[in-house]
A protein has these predicted regions:
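A short beta-loop-alpha structural element at the N-terminal edge
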Residues: 7-21, 146
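Terminal substrate-recognition subdomain of acyl/acetyltransferases
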Residues: 1-3, 140-152
Length: 152
């Protein structure tokens, strides 16, 4: 008898997840974070890191830092074999919903990462500036989402 399939499952990231998370990071980013950076972020009281699991596999992650009433998305990555399934959208929406009183959400993205830029725009993020040579070889596109827009 086959076990019933379960959909994606979101949970807080643990240090025991770092091997899988760092693998996804390495497959997704030209300059992935070191284990030391990951451990430091997981220990921060101002950060929330979530993973998305399918079955027993971590397929994506997101990190958000909370500064007063603003959020900064520090990391979003989905395993290449699991992209284009809405996982990044689920991760972003889950992380933002953890902060119902947040006003603004900021992030940086490579302008050449057109899939991510398109996703962020579809979620309501707007371009607010650029950081020259932020990635060394490329500028960063600064994007902001106003969560207060439309609230009474």
């Amino acid at each position: 008898m086959r076990e019933p399939e379960t959909g994606p499952f979101l949970r807080r990231m643990k240090t025991s997840d770092l091997r899988a998370v760092m693998d996804i990071d390495a497959r997704s980013l030209p300059k992935p974070w070191s284990e030391g950076i990951w451990r430091s972020e997981l220990e921060s009281p101002f950060a929330l890191y979530l993973v998305l699991e399918e079955g027993d596999e971590i397929v994506g992650q997101i990190g958000v830092r909370n500064v007063l009433d603003e959020l900064h998305v520090t990391n979003v990555a989905v395993h290449p074999e699991h992209r284009r399934r809405g996982h990044a959208r689920v991760l972003i929406q889950a992380a933002l919903s953890a902060y119902p009183d947040a006003g603004l959400v900021h992030l940086e993205v490579r302008p050449t990462n057109t899939a991510a830029v398109t996703l962020y725009r579809s979620l309501g993020f707007r371009e607010t500036g650029r950081r020259p040579r932020y990635y060394g070889d490329e500028d960063a596109l600064l994007m902001t989402l106003d969560l207060l827009a439309g609230r009474p």
